Amino acid sequence: MKKVYNVLAVMMLAAIMSSCSQKNNDTFIVVANESDLPRENETVEILFKALQDINEGLTAENVVILDAEGKQVPSQVYTEADSTTVKLVFQASVKAGETVEYKVQKGVREDYPVKAYSRHVPERKDDYAYENNKVAGRIYGPALNGPNDPRTFGSDIWLKSTERMVIDERYYNELEKGISYHHDYGEGMDCYKVGNTLGGGALVPHVLEQKEIAGENFVLQKEKLVYDVVGSVITGNNWATCKHVCNGPVRTKAVFTYEPFNVGNVKYSAVRELELDANTHFVKWVTTFIPEEHKADSMVVQLAAIKHDVIAEHVDKEWVAFTEKASDPQDNEQPGNISVAVVYDPADLADNPIKYNGTSPDGHACIVTKEAVNKPITVWTGSGWSKAGIDSPEKWTEMVKNFAYAQKHPLNVTIKK
């Protein structure tokens, strides 16, 4: 009997040691909020290899993120456009001044619904449409490069008052059933006007243009967007190529290239990244302007969005927010208000003083500064609707202010083994 007890004791001790060893080998992603602003559903981004290096057998198919209560947190593993960099993203909620730990382990992933989605829409003249559970929009593609078409980096804002994905349904109804997406049937619409403007926001070159005034003996210098000979805003043609990177429960992403276009005496091509995460009203754009033959080291750029029937506006150093009346061609009484914002990366503006922020001569809310060429420049464009939670200009201004503050005070993310 004594031998039996000894065997049982050894087995229990081994189990305890195994349990302790397993706990000691647990991996945690530690998210610290050192700011004065609570963060709700803010995306955390980790190089997946950093987790794989300390977790043998961890894959995109079996990685699970758990919160403090042991519940799965929706996560996403995707490969960047370079086909090499692999990232894991999930969203954390952390109170001001606090730290939260998320456990990483191998397991069976739950079926997380897609909350960030985008795609090329060849059936609608090469649109590239994007959405999350809060906002939606599109940019125009090469099929709209005609002389009377909108040629712009600017985005078209789509309004939505539902958390489900709607762009595929709206395109199908518009193109196959003749049900216009320009009218609100209860969940939103496309009533925003872009044309040859920067629409809901974009980063573009900005030049000092010299115009000779007929009959006068002087030259007038006027700061403005780059204009073509007929006076339309241009940034070259619409995107030439696009590469879809991912959709998922946390993030959608795509990369666009633009053919060379003239900016003063220099030709530039451009690369733009679109990144939209779940649970936000703000789209991240990373733009790189590439001069031909290295003819420039720096350039003046303008982050801007067109203003229509504006009822409120707030201009800050790093952002501009405004609210304007929406317009439904079939229902002028009930369209509500659209809120729009542009936000410049505060890290960039710390090194590049602002030349101007306010309203440009052609009616854009804008921030003008100087940047190096061949440099990825990060900005955000934001939108909201009074029928989808953004019920006052004051609420929108506060949301934009807090978002800009969060970019200046990012979460501190580390891995603990």
What are the residue ranges of the model-derived segments?
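Solvent-exposed beta-strand/loop surfaces of large extracellular or lumenal domains
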Residues: 58-85, 262, 309-324, 347-355
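Sec-dependent signal peptide recognition
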Residues: 2-10
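Beta-strand-rich recognition/accessory modules
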Residues: 81, 86-94, 342-417
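Acidic, contiguous internal or C-terminal segments within carbohydrate-active enzymes
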Residues: 244-299
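C-terminal motif of bacterial Sec signal peptides marking the signal peptidase cleavage site
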Residues: 18-19
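Polysaccharide-binding surfaces and accessory modules of carbohydrate-active proteins
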Residues: 24-27, 298-354
